UniProtKB/Swiss-Prot annotation:
Phylogenetic classification of the source organism: Eukaryota, Metazoa, Chordata, Craniata, Vertebrata
CDD domains with a match to the protein in the record: RING-HC_RNF123 (cd16541), SPRY_RNF123 (cd12882)
Positions of the B30.2/SPRY domain: 74-254
Protein name, as recorded: E3 ubiquitin-protein ligase RNF123
Oligomeric form and interacting partners: Component of the KPC complex composed of RNF123/KPC1 and UBAC1/KPC2. Interacts with UBAC1 and CDKN1B via its N-terminal domain. Interacts with RIGI (via N-terminus) and IFIH1 (via N-terminus).
Biological process per Gene Ontology, one example term: protein polyubiquitination
Protein purpose: Catalytic subunit of the KPC complex that acts as E3 ubiquitin-protein ligase. Promotes the ubiquitination and proteasome-mediated degradation of CDKN1B which is the cyclin-dependent kinase inhibitor at the G0-G1 transition of the cell cycle. Also acts as a key regulator of the NF-kappa-B signaling by promoting maturation of the NFKB1 component of NF-kappa-B: acts by catalyzing ubiquitination of the NFKB1 p105 precursor, leading to limited proteasomal degradation of NFKB1 p105 and generation of the active NFKB1 p50 subunit.
Residues recorded with modification Asymmetric dimethylarginine: R683
Cross-referenced Gene3D superfamilies: 2.60.120.920, Zinc/RING finger domain, C3HC4 (zinc finger)
Pathway the protein contributes to: Protein modification; protein ubiquitination
Residues that, per the record, bind Zn(2+) 1: C1254, C1257, C1274, C1277
Organism: Homo sapiens
């Protein structure tokens, strides 16, 4: 192996030591006196060297081995103890007892030190116990859930409900609930968080037991422990499902040693002394330089020392590493000796100096150690470094994290070490994503935030979507000063965090370097393979928590990756003018169908990939010149047939881990083990990716490219970046795409992975972290409420004043804590830079979707998550980053809103998208989009043909599709224009609960007259659009209201039973949903009648009369059910059941009233008469229902004024804040008109014999006869029937025509059955 140093390379074989005492003199060695001085300087530098090591005999390379042996001799008292130590029983190497010392199901790491709970409350103990003396061990907390950590005896018996501390002679500390346990429980200690270290101490001389958290003593927890014959205590833990920790019994240096206490596992004392002496010699080499010309030794700074190929220096180092190399493979020595040495270099020198020394050290390791030795050393070094970074406390200047990251960067700058770590360690063995995470402090006082942010402040209102912001009082001078002081503190914190983030970005820049391909594959392409596997594990294991990267890590990883990605993207643009800037980035559509990037089993827009390859193979050939290998299609078909049989061989290929279970379970080893650093070595099975069978000449447009499947590991740089005749990832460019590449193909794959990361867990975590801001708002509201009560409380009530003062103090202290923690969250998660990253990702997705849409049918190959990320990232920008940062301040905000609106409008009903979930997401996003003025205006800005196409899709018949969301969209376009439909909170709730701040709230109305006009134009076009749409709306209204009535009957029956009954909350929710659907359907009918009244009132249209009669029938049914005296509806409303808050008279009656007023008051006289006659002709019509609207029990006598309404009754007049005076006047006019018309109709009506009534409805006289069968009914019944069915009611004969029929008439008029 070769190593680089001072521009020269040296072969390790030339300087291998030999045992031959008679070897010849090596040429190039300096003269004897200088050699003696040099060797004495190097090997006498150890402070602990025994006298024998410094003899008067001149030192040379012949007697140096003997001298080294004497130097490394260790006194007898420092030798490791191989037998039993007094006070301890068990193996000298302490691990978890996975063979018999456990209860429940647990997953144990390969090193038998990390454990994950895999059952309700599993327990496990160690293999070694203690009965005398003072002992301790450390537990690294990987998750902050329910765990009980401590000690137990071998006689303790545990189960799935009782763990450590729940039995006699077992003692535990629980930082989740902040308690100590020994059969009973009391408060103790502090709350722990992920990243903390708990030290468990037991003093069996005094019989006491205590705990420390991050080196700070929590005090004595238990006294008077049972001691004596047969009493020995084991370290033990009980943990709930998915919780994880790692133990350190002494196999590594303790992070927080305690004087007088001994770790359960003895350190390798003798080897530690030898390693420290050898390190002293090594440091001496780096500080001395030979001057053979002058014959003297020169002192040299380590950062300026260079290996110049001098044989004397090389042989000296070879002797040192002959003894040092085996020691550097041991975990304890790497962390205690090598890590401390390297950290000292980083802490004392500048970054440049530290980098120089670390680079020299790594060069020497690779030169003088065997490959397997240096690889083990580097692996242990990175594991220790990661552990130190993750479990370091947060200090105000983040100095510890900065030092660990600087050392990581220095190591990764060494090309050979970087490639080895990237290929074998970073993603395979380590949780390397931890390096990009900045943990949030649970205890702000320990993190120094009180000094950094001495003044606290919190906003007084919420600006999140869906929450009505309260009127903000004018800011006082004192509040303004507090806010500005708080913002200055936040700025100081943000600057310190930015230093750490920049170091993390530097790490990723090193991993994404593609210019280090001398003698091997460049780092970027190794990273791509590992990164894709990382994504596969997290995508395929979403239900298996141990296999997932924690979402808080993923958020930080995504932001650092975007920064590094954009750096390289713009760097490539600087040297390639034809490429694009990162601001114009997108993923070309051919990446989704050429198979060069593996999307695992993620759903495509058009369904499964195997299905798309079969159904769209002709389109692939014609548009992209791609032919799928027939063998590929055949193997895919066989995979589909054998899908149920796949898991067995897949699991057989995975290595088993140590399982702490009662019997053998065929569990695959989890990918993210509980250890802070250990992961799975062999995580993945082979995954498929399609690669070119590379042609050797340019392709003509008529030639096709046949593709075949390769595993991810088999891809080469050429498969990704392409070559002269190979487009790599961009194989199969459609004609719509430009010929010039956007950037390097490898960066496109990284960008694709970043989008996938956001979809996997980042969005979910962004929503979760908003909880801190919500807590601040809730406590601020509680504090204001308490202060108001203090001001109103009489001074004589000192007891109440004392309680209120106490509450005020508690709320103030909690707000101080939360406001500082919120500052940390805003700096690490919701800063302006993070917001720009998410915004950039949104724009990338929008451009990707737009380019994919242009490919026609090939758009179906796009993974669903691109649409999901576009929807969710917009939601995050709008809801999660305020009020500190506003989306409206982002560059190109209006244009982005419009582009997203165009995508939602076009694709919510796109036939190329088949997935139910993604179609629902698109529909819900569009429904949310039209609720808010800014986004609704964006919908109105999209091209007119797209707007019309969107409305046409909304007006499609409701059958055979999810219609509820469509209906909500139409309602939101209307809200603010309907009768009494301008409220933001349900008026009937405000009348009963004036001060309830938790009432359901709605957005302020923002109707769209433009989209309403498109709807009117479309309903007037063609003879079938309006009838089919309205018929489906009437059908759904009939269903929804009937279901609602049936459910409230069941609720009423349950409430009237003598025994105590609880109505199922799910049933109440469904009932309320049916009511809300009924109201929304009525509002859509109101909008339709208002915009296009002729659809119902122009009887020259063949379906108008039928639609009007159906409408009148349903309106009468609703009115009769809701307005009857002491009826079912009244009784259920009076119950005020939780979950039925929206069910009341007002919402449904004003919707019905709006329709009736439009039909009977606002239209021309002729149309009003038609509507009146149809309404009165319906047998269910009752004038009393119309009187009910104005609070009148009976209709008034003709010519008399309306009496004052009864306050106990429902009346629209009681809602003057929501119903205008003009609207009330129209209702009164409608009542007067119907009173007069019903009286005239009653006087003019003639009795009808039963034989002449329609045999279907028994409400109207027979007026139509069917041909050819001759059966009869009224026109309303047969017209409604023919909308859905062409068979006769009675004989099932196909109806050819319907003829008018009148008793006694000799002629008839024929009309078409259609």
């Amino acid at each position: 192996m070769a190593s680089k140093g001072a521009g020269m390379s040296f072969s390790r074989k030339s300087y291998r030591l030999t045992s031959d005492a008679e070897k010849s003199r090596v040429t190039g060695i300096v003269q004897e006196k200088l050699l003696n001085d040099y060797l004495n300087r190097i090997f006498s530098s150890s402070e602990h060297a025994p006298p024998a090591a410094t003899s008067r005999k001149p030192l040379n390379f012949q007697n140096l081995p003997e001298h080294l042996d004497q130097l490394l001799q260790v006194d007898n008292e420092e030798e490791e103890s191989q037998g039993q130590v007094e006070g301890r029983l068990g193996p000298s190497t302490v691990v978890l007892d996975h063979t018999g010392g456990f209860e429940g199901l647990l997953l144990v790491d390969d090193d038998l030190l990390g454990v994950i709970g895999h059952s309700n409350f599993g327990t496990i103990r160690s293999t070694t116990c203690v009965y005398k003396g003072k002992w301790l061990y450390e537990v690294l907390i990987s998750s902050q859930g329910l765990m009980q950590i401590g000690w137990c005896t071998i006689s303790c018996r545990f189960n799935q409900e009782e763990g450590v501390g729940d039995t006699h002679n077992s003692y535990a500390y629980d930082g989740n609930r902040v308690r100590k346990w020994n059969v009973t429980t009391t408060n103790y200690g502090k709350a722990w968080a992920a990243g903390d270290i708990v030290s468990c101490l037991i003093d069996l001389d005094d019989g006491t037991l205590s705990f420390c958290l991050n080196g700070v003593s929590l005090g004595t927890a238990f006294e008077n422990l049972s001691r004596g014959l047969g009493m020995a205590y084991f370290p033990a833990i009980s943990l709930s499902f998915k919780e994880s920790v790692a133990f350190n019994f002494g196999s590594r240096p303790l992070r927080y040693p305690v004087a007088g206490y001994r770790p359960l596992q003895d350190p390798p004392s003798a080897d530690l002394v030898r390693a420290q002496r050898l390190l002293g010699c090594f440091r001496a080499v780096l500080s001395v330089e030979l001057d053979p010309v002058e014959g003297r030794l020169l002192d040299k700074e380590s950062s300026k020392w260079r290996l110049r190929g001098q044989p004397t220096v090389l042989l000296t180092l070879a002797h040192i590493f002959h003894h040092f190399a085996p020691l550097l493979r041991k975990v304890y020595l790497v962390e205690a000796v090598l890590m401390s040495f390297l950290l000292g270099i980083v802490e004392k020198g500048t970054p440049t100096q530290a980098q120089s020394v670390v680079h020299q050290v790594l060069d020497l390791l690779w030169l003088f150690m065997e490959d397997y030795e240096v690889q083990d050393c580097l692996k242990q070094l990175m594991m220790s470094l990661l552990r130190l970074y993750r479990f370091s406390p947060i200090v105000p200047d983040l100095g510890l994290q900065i030092h660990y990251l600087r050392l990581t960067i220095a190591i990764l700058r060494h090309e050979k070490s970087r490639k080895f770590l990237l290929s074998n360690v970073l993603f395979d063995v380590l949780r390397s994503v931890v390096f990009f995470y900045i943990k949030s402090p649970l205890r702000v006082e320990e993190a120094g935030l009180q000094e950094l942010i001495p003044t606290t402040w919190w906003p007084h209102c919420s600006s999140r979507e869906g929450k009505e912001s309260t009127e903000m009082k004018e800011e006082t001078a004192e509040e303004r000063l507090r806010r500005r002081a708080y913002e200055r503190g936040c700025q100081r914190l943000r600057k310190r965090i930015e230093v750490v983030e920049e170091l993390q970005v530097q790490i990723l820049k090193l991993l994404l370097d593609n210019k280090d391909d001398n003698g091997g594959e460049a780092s970027r392409y190794i990273f791509l393979t590992k990164f894709r596997k990382f994504l596969q594990e997290n995508a395929s294991g979403r239900g298996n928590m141990p296999m997932l990267c924690p979402p808080e890590y993923m958020v930080c990883f995504l932001h650092r990756l975007i920064s590094a990605l954009r750096y390289y993207w713009d760097e490539y643009k600087a040297s390639n003018p034809h490429a694009s800037f990162s601001e114009e980035a997108y993923i070309p559509p051919q990446v989704f169908y050429n198979g060069k990037v593996d999307y695992f089993d993620l759903q495509r827009l058009g369904g499964l990939l195997s299905h798309l390859r079969k159904t769209l193979k002709d389109d692939l050939a014609s548009k992209a010149n791609i032919v799928i290998d027939p063998l590929e299609l055949q193997s895919t078909a066989m995979d589909d047939l054998d899908e149920d049989e796949e898991p067995a061989p897949a699991m057989a290929q995975r290595p088993m881990q140590a399982l702490a279970v009662g019997g053998p379970l065929p569990l695959p080893r989890p990918g993210w083990l509980s250890s802070p650093t250990l992961g799975r070595a062999n995580r993945f099975l082979s995954t498929a990716a399609v690669s070119l069978m590379t042609p050797r000449r340019p392709l003509s447009t008529s030639e096709k490219v046949k593709v075949r499947t390769l595993s991810v590991e088999q891809r080469t740089r050429e498969d990704i970046e392409g070559s002269h005749w190979n487009e790599g990832l961009l194989l199969g460019r459609p004609p719509e795409e430009p010929e010039q590449p956007l950037t390097e193909n490898s960066l496109l794959e990284v960008l694709d992975g970043a989008v996938m990361m956001y979809n996997l867990s980042v969005h979910q975590q962004l929503g979760k972290m908003v909880g801190v801001s919500d807590d601040v708002n809730e406590y601020a509201m509680a504090l204001r409420d308490t202060e108001d009560k203090l001001r109103r409380c009489p001074k004589r009530r000192k007891d109440i004043l004392a309680e209120l003062t106490k509450s005020q103090k508690v709320f103030s202290e909690k707000l101080d804590h939360l406001s500082r923690r919120l500052a940390w969250v805003h700096a690490t998660v919701y800063s302006q830079e993070k917001m720009l990253d998410i915004y950039w990702l949104l724009r990338v997705c929008l451009r990707t979707i737009e380019h994919g849409d242009r490919t026609g049918s090939l758009f179906a190959f796009m993974p669903e998550f691109y649409l999901s990320v576009a929807i969710n990232s917009y939601s995050a920008l709008k809801n999660y980053f305020g009020p500190v940062h506003s989306m409206e301040e982002l560059p190109g905000y209006e244009e982005t809103l419009t582009r997203l609106a165009a995508i939602l409008a076009k694709h919510f009903a796109d036939a190329r998208i088949v997935g139910t979930d993604i179609r629902d997401s698109l529909m819900q996003a569009l429904a949310s989009y039209v609720c808010y003025p800014h986004s609704l205006r964006a919908v109105e800005r999209i091209p007119e043909e797209q707007r019309i196409a969107m409305v046409r899709n909304l007006l499609a018949p409701y059958e055979q599709r999810p219609w509820a969301q469509t209906n909500w969209i139409l309602v939101r376009l209307w809200r603010g224009c309907g009768f009494g439909y301008r409220y933001t909170r349900l008026p009937h709730l405000l009348k009963t609960k004036l001060e309830d701040a938790n009432l359901p709230s709605l957005q302020k109305p923002c109707p769209s007259t433009l989209l309403q006009q498109h709807m009117a134009d479309l309903l007037q076009q063609g003879p079938d659009v309006a009838p089919s749409f309205l018929n489906s709306v009437l059908n759904q209204l009939n269903w929804a209201f009937s279901e609602f009535i049936g459910m409230i009957q069941e609720i009423q029956q349950a409430a009237e039973r003598l025994e105590r009954n609880f109505v199922d909350s799910r049933q109440l929710k469904v009932c309320a949903t049916c009511f809300d659907l009924s109201v929304s359907l009525l509002r859509v009918l109101e909008m339709t009648i208002t915009l296009v009244p002729e659809i119902f009132l122009d009887w020259t249209r063949p379906t108008s009369e039928m639609l009007l009669r159906r409408l009148a029938q349903l309106l009468n049914q609703v009115l009769n059910r809701v307005t009857a005296e002491r009826n079912l509806f009244d009784r259920v409303v009076t119950l005020r059941l939780p979950g039925l808050e929206s069910v009341d008279h007002y919402p449904i009656l004003v919707a019905v009233t709006g329709i009736l007023v439009q039909l009977l008051v606002r239209g021309p006289a002729s149309e009003r008469e038609q509507a009146t006659s149809v309404l009165l002709a319906d047998p269910c019509f009752q004038l009393r229902s119309i009187c009910y609207l104005l609070g009148q029990p009976e209709p008034p006598a003709p010519g008399t004024a309306l009496p004052a309404p009864d306050r106990k009754r429902f009346s629209l007049q009681s809602y003057a804040d929501y119903i205008s005076a003009d609207e009330l006047a129209q209702v009164e006019q409608m009542l007067a008109h119907l009173t007069s018309a019903s009286a005239q109709a009653a006087a003019a009506s003639l009795p009808t014999s039963e034989e002449d009534l329609c045999p279907i409805c028994y409400a109207h006289p027979i007026s139509a006869v069917f041909q050819p069968c001759g059966h009869k009914s009224c026109k309303a019944c047969i017209n409604q029937h023919l909308m859905n069915n062409k068979d006769c009611f009675f004989c099932k004969t196909t109806i050819v025509s319907v003829e008018d029929w009148e008793k006694g008439a000799n002629t008839s008029t024929t009309s078409s059955a259609a």
